[in-house]
UniProtKB/Swiss-Prot annotation:
In larvae, both myosuppressin and myosuppressin(2-10) are expressed in the CNS but not the midgut, thoracic perisympathetic organs (tPSO) and abdominal perisympathetic organs (aPSO). Myosuppressin is expressed in the ring gland (at protein level). In adults, myosuppressin is expressed in brain, cardiaca, corpora allata and thoracic-abdominal ganglion (at protein level). GO terms for cellular component: extracellular region. It is found in: Secreted. It comes from Delia radicum. This is Myosuppressin.
Length: 10
């Protein structure tokens, strides 16, 4: 999901 990607990005 996009949310998971954002969290992993940070």
């Amino acid at each position: 999901t996009d949310v998971d990607h954002v969290f992993l990005r940070f």
